Amino acid sequence: MARILITSAIPYINGIKHLGNLVGSQLPADLYARYARARGHEVMFICATDEHGTPAELAAAKAGKPVAEYCAEMHAVQSDIAKRFGLSFDHFGRSSSERNKALTQYFAGKLAENGLIEEVSEKQVYSHADGRFLPDRYIEGTCPNCGYDKARGDQCENCTKQLDPTDLIDPRSAISGSTDLEVRETKHLYLRQSALKDQLDAWIDSKTDWPILTTSIAKKWLHDGDGLQDRGITRDLDWGVPVKKGTEDWPGMEGKVFYVWFDAPIEYIAGTAEWADANGLDDAAWERWWRTDKGADEVRYVQFMGKDNVPFHTLSFPATIMGSGDPWKLVDYIKSFNYLTYDGGQFSTSQGRGVFMDQALEILPADYWRWWLLSHAPENSDSEFTWENFQASVNKDLADVLGNFASRVTKFCRSKYGEEVPAGGAYGPAEEALIAELTTKLRAYEGHMDAMEVRKAAAELRAIWVAGNEYLQAAAPWSVFKTDPDAAAAIIRLGLNLVRFYAVLSQPFIPDASAALLRAMKAEDAGWPGDVAEALAALPAGHAFAVPEVTFAKISDADREAWAEKFSGTRD
């Protein structure tokens, strides 16, 4: 049994997330966490809301609420939606927690102690129209590198190049759109990432198993242009972690807060400490996951995120960890994702474009969405959500293949033998061939899941479902029953065991449907199959079952058209 630490990029507090956010981090992280638990590993799965920075301040102002109150309410909303989507976090924390505040200040103090913090007088953009300094991400303009006209002052989302606001061509306030901007002098703390460049470069080179998407972005930031730059880690804002050197005041930094991208990744650690607190455990309980001098050297740490978060997780956060000089656990594997697009354009939280998590659940249960999103995960390139594709995938994969199989087998058994596994007959060459085929496919499925190859795993799982359907069609128990009820009983006995087998294997993808099938099979305690032949004999003759409710309903053309129309504009 291994110990696996899993973190998902933490979502901003400023509103309910769309399906593109979900498939880029939380959902594949949940898939892996559920699979790892099913295989018997000890798992710690941490996520949180990212509550600091200008987005939180602006969203609270728009809602007419104090920012702390707004964040508390939105955390509750996001937590509830996550539960309804079946996201199995061990803890869903808050970056505004006291734990994160203390840890962020602690790391800053250690970095300063080690000569890796520099005080810099710099010029920062002030917006007269907004009456405030503008954080980097709230200045928009044209990227000097690729010409994208909605580049932000910290990074171009189009080419991923790291930017400063003064690099932008024709800059404007992202808040008001005003171009009445003035550059003023202010003092900030910088993390001397450049001093750790060689160490970071060597560390990334050692990660030969990382996805190309992850390493290529990290290398670009390390070597393009002037190479890795020092990074400002403080801001002139009211809301955030107050700047302190450990527990001491930091002269000249009064009234400033740490940059959201400095404190947000530290919340992975703080969130684990919050988990310990919530469960009445001492610090040793969370330190064994994070301190290599206290047991974390045995932990495999995996992070999930969208590609726009890669630079901060491959460079800035590791620089914080390395620079502290303390024995903290560094990430072992970063699984990054491209973007999910929506009917030819971008999903957008700020513009309200696309389908959002709460809206999705108003239409259909979570498993419909989980299956489509994971089986179309944007791993090697961007993926596009279309209502036609969604309908086809749900109807063919979930309704026609998996749901139809469970329905046919259980209903036929009930009509001919009653609601218990029938006795009689024995497995023959066809059944042995199916067991051999499923053994090969199960090992392939496990291999893809171990490697976090999400789309390949989904395709293999579907192939496992299809194999059972093809067997049932060829074996034709409805015909065999007329002349040899015992032989038909053996076919149906295998079929009922296949329903149980499928439910166990499908649980990481579609947990609610899997749980319903296992309840119907009265096999809630079913564990991951080691041997396929044993798994397909797990329900013996005489074992009671119930015919399950419709596992997945088909999506009609009328529904598809209505939803496409409903979500063709932007959210209010």
UniProtKB/Swiss-Prot annotation:
Which Gene Ontology molecular function entries are recorded, alphabetically?
A: ATP binding; metal ion binding; methionine-tRNA ligase activity
Entry binding sites for ATP: 349
At the top of the EC hierarchy, this enzyme's class is ligase
Has keyword Nucleotide-binding?
Answer: yes
> Which CDD domains does the UniProt entry name for this protein?
Anticodon_Ia_Met, MetRS_core
UniProt subcellular location: Cytoplasm
Q: Which UniProt keywords apply?
A: Aminoacyl-tRNA synthetase, ATP-binding, Cytoplasm, Ligase, Metal-binding, Nucleotide-binding, Protein biosynthesis, Zinc
What positions does the record give for the motif labelled 'KMSKS' region?
A: 346-350
Reaction it catalyzes: tRNA(Met) + L-methionine + ATP = L-methionyl-tRNA(Met) + AMP + diphosphate
- Gene3D superfamilies, from UniProt? HUPs (3.40.50.620), Isoleucyl-tRNA Synthetase, Domain 1 (1.10.730.10), Methionyl-tRNA synthetase, Zn-domain (2.20.28.20)
Q: Where does Zn(2+) bind?
A: 143, 146, 156, 159
One biological process term from GO is: methionyl-tRNA aminoacylation
| Pfam families, per the entry | Anticodon_3, tRNA-synt_1g
Motif 'HIGH' region: positions: 11-21
The record's Gene Ontology cellular component field reads: aminoacyl-tRNA synthetase multienzyme complex; cytosol
Q: Which cofactor does it need?
A: Zn(2+)
Can you quote the record's cofactor note?
Binds 1 zinc ion per subunit.
E.C. number: 6.1.1.10
Function recorded in the entry? Is required not only for elongation of protein synthesis but also for the initiation of all mRNA translation through initiator tRNA(fMet) aminoacylation.
Read off the PANTHER family from this record: METHIONINE--TRNA LIGASE, METHIONINE--TRNA LIGASE, CYTOPLASMIC
Q: State the similarity comment.
A: Belongs to the class-I aminoacyl-tRNA synthetase family. MetG type 1 subfamily.
Subunit structure as annotated in this protein's UniProt entry: Monomer.
What is the protein's name according to its record? Methionine--tRNA ligase
Q: Lineage from the top down?
A: Bacteria, Pseudomonadati, Pseudomonadota, Alphaproteobacteria, Rhodobacterales
Per the record, the gene is metG
